[in-house]
Amino acid sequence: HTYNSKSEYFVYKNLEDRKCYCFDDIDLKILEGEYFVMATSTYKTEILRTSGLKMLEKTFYVDMQYNVVPMTKGETFTYYQLDIYRYFIGRKEQSMNMDNFVRNQEHHKKMIKWLIEYYTHISSKLSSNKREYIEIILTYTLNTHYSIYCEYDKNHARAYKEIVDFDQYLLKVNKALYERINCMAYIRYNRKTKFKFVRLNGRKWNTAMKMARRLKGKF
């Protein structure tokens, strides 16, 4: 990717160039947080067809559907260390900019609810490795969603209502995912305090919480 006119070459350092891997046999730890996203992945047409992938229309962040849905049908993957895709980051107009996350929060909510319900429906049909992989991807996405409301949305009354409603929704639809993200200190803290600090001033209170955690240990 390129940021401030400086380029960084992204590689999956623990994967061998041109080697074919069986997804169910690999130890996911070798990926070290370097997962397969739209900018670094391509699928055979047949896999896209059999997966039934149909992206939400007129919606931001649907790349997350591409990151998850075809993965349920793929059995093997081959890594090619090629410089094909150039991604420019840090631009204000990007949908990944946090201000735009806040502005487009309804898009993000629509997308992540779709993913949660999709995964809940098909998870029992997946291998344990695929379930773990997809849950890792969903955990990253859920972290972003909670951050939008707990830290960045300056409309605190709206943020409070949205995150309380979403948290209850997640508990109802997929308790395992709900419990999985409880490992994140700021989510656990906000749940314990019933998100009241989001209503007051989310970012300041969550920053204070993170500082307190460093000094005094886990909440």
Task: Please tell me what each predicted stretch does.
Residues 1-80, 87-103:
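Donor-binding/catalytic cores of nucleotide-activated saccharide
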Residues 27-28, 116, 135, 164-167, ...:
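Generic detector of well-ordered alpha-helical segments enriched in charged/polar residues
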Residues 38-39, 53, 71-74, 79-80, ...:
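Gram-positive cell-envelope targeting signals
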Residues 82-91, 97-126, 144-174:
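Catalytic core of nucleotide-sugar-dependent glycosyltransferases
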Residues 125-131, 178-182:
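Short, surface-exposed acidic
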Residues 132-148:
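Amphipathic alpha-helical repeat scaffolds of TPR domains
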Residues 150-219:
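Membrane-interface aromatic/basic loop that binds lipid-linked glycans or pyrophosphate carriers
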